[in-house]
Structure formats: structure tokens, C-alpha cells
Amino acid sequence: DTETTDENTNTLTVCIDAGHGGKDNGSEAEGRIEKDDTLKIALAVESYLKSQNINVVMTRTEDIFWKLSKRCSIANDANADYFVSLHRNIGEGYGVETWVSHTADEEANALAKNILSELETVGIARNRGVKAGSQSNPEEDFIVNRDSNMASCIVELGFLNVPDDNQNFDNHLDEYAKAIGDAIIKTAQTYQPDKMGI
């Protein structure tokens, strides 16, 4: 069906990655497990984007383990325009932050910034900003940012060990999902207008 093929090349494709999964729980705090929260928000983002006629590819839709290289391959093989990896934080601090590659272009930075701005309108404890590289080294990127071929970012949706962040996450799950989706669409309208029918 050539029509479908043509249609797909003219439609934005977004890969949503629910961090961790399966044998990899991610962070844990007082019985709360990161892999469960990331899947909840990822499925909600998928649902919202599909309601906006955006083509969505998921790295996982259930509690399974994929290596980071496999997550990148899923996005790359789908020729996704954006790759958004959803996580929860842990440690000292509170609020939401995004991470991009230290060589990220304007589009990836805009994606990360737009996500924070949209989440801020819903309500987050603190906007911790867009960060580059990784915690240990500003020039050493997280694998999902390093090995994906498209504009990408990691979103750390509050700290698992901070009650206020957990409450915000639970009470605003669908609103957070819509905010992330709207930020992706807003970025695409600027940088991928042809795929948005503009």
C-alpha cells in the first residue's frame, strides 16, 4: 500500500522510552519502583500523542528488560524524529530536569526546554533546567542520548525519595503526559513543520 508509506513519511514519529523494566528496577525508595512509574507515564504520553494523530513507537509497553542499545535501535530503526526517555530521579534535591547530549543541536535543546516549560504550567516542585552530558561528566553522554540518531532527551520526573514530587507525579499523571506531548508537538511545529502538515 504505497499511500500508507507516503503518509508515514509525512507524519511525525516519536519514540517514547519508559526507563528501566524487567530485572532492572531503576531507583527504589520506600517500596516505590522507578520502572513502574516510567511505564505509567510512558503509556499516558503514548495515548495522548496518538489522540493528536502522532505516530508513536514505544520501547516497551510492559514490564520487560531491554538493553540501552536495543532502546536506541528501536528509535533508529523506526526513523523516529524524536526520542524521549522517561525516568524518575533519586538523591539530594527535588523537582524535574531534562538531559541532552553535550553535542545536542538546537532542536534537541528546544525539545528538552519545551518539556520543562509545559510541565511547569501543570505544576512541578522546581524546574531544575536542561543539563548536558551526565551527572559524572558533562562531556560523557547517557547512552540513549549518545546513540540515538534524532533529537533526544531524558526527562527526570521528580525524585522518588521526595514525597512532594511523588504526590505531583501521582496527582498530575495525565496532565504531565499531555504536557510532554504538547512540548513534543510544539517543538515539531517549529523544527519539523512539513511533518506536522504546516
List each model region and its residues:
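Active-site-proximal helix/loop segments of hydrolytic enzymes
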Residues: 36-198
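Polar low-complexity intrinsically disordered regions enriched in Ser/Thr and small residues
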Residues: 4-6, 29, 161
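Short, surface-exposed beta-strand segments enriched in small/polar/acidic residues
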Residues: 14-28
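Non-catalytic propeptide/linker segments at domain boundaries
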Residues: 1-12
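Nucleotide donor/acceptor-binding cores
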Residues: 11-14, 96
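Glycine- and acidic-residue-enriched helix-capping/strand-helix junction motifs
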Residues: 25-40
